Amino acid sequence: MTGSEEKVRFLVGERVYLRPIEKEDLADVRRWANDPEIRQLTGEVTPMSQAGADEFLERVRTDKERVWFVVVVKEGDRVIGEAGLLRIFWPWRTTDLSIIIGDKEAWGQGYGSEAIRLLMDYAFGYLNMHRVSLGVVGFNRRALRFYEKVGFKQEGVQRDGYYHDHAYHDFVMMSILEDEFRAMQQGEGMGS
């Protein structure tokens, strides 16, 4: 890529944008996937090798039930995370959401809230989804508060559904429906 070429900004917000993941992003994705703190907080159990990163990229490029992006801060075009929709089940108009802000310096800056708004607007507005769901490791209180702030509601707990550090932990299931998302957009501004 030459200096004059610009990457496609797919979903654009005020401070961040989402763009399709590219091969050059895999070093960051792999670093985050192998970070012990991030793995603990997200429930990821398998380290990512270079071959695994290449397989991941191929999967997100070809899987019709998945869309995947990197989260980029507009100022400086700095990649800070990844986000996507997976297990899209078109007949029921449902999908699961995943987001990781892997750059720890970007934690607590509101980038995740903006990125998730962009992704949910895409899911509900463009893909015509009815329901977006996710799972959260029960001891990750910060993530639970974050998802509640952006409109997700707890709908159940998989008791002892996650094993980490020689102990079982709960896994909290959450979701947001299209009408709830639209009401938040019109009302309180999705936690902004």
Predicted regions and their residues:
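A short, well-structured alpha-helix characteristic of acyl/acetyltransferase catalytic modules
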Residues: 1-55, 180-192
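Conserved G/P- and acidic residue-centered "switch" motifs that form tight phosphate/ATP-binding loops
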Residues: 25, 77, 110, 140
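Amphipathic alpha-helical recognition patches that constitute DNA-binding helices
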Residues: 28, 96, 114, 131, ...
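Acetyl-CoA-dependent GNAT
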Residues: 46-106, 177-180, 189-191
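Conserved GNAT acetyl-CoA-binding A-motif
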Residues: 125-135
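Conserved catalytic-core motifs of GNAT/GCN5-like acyltransferases
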Residues: 133-136, 153-170
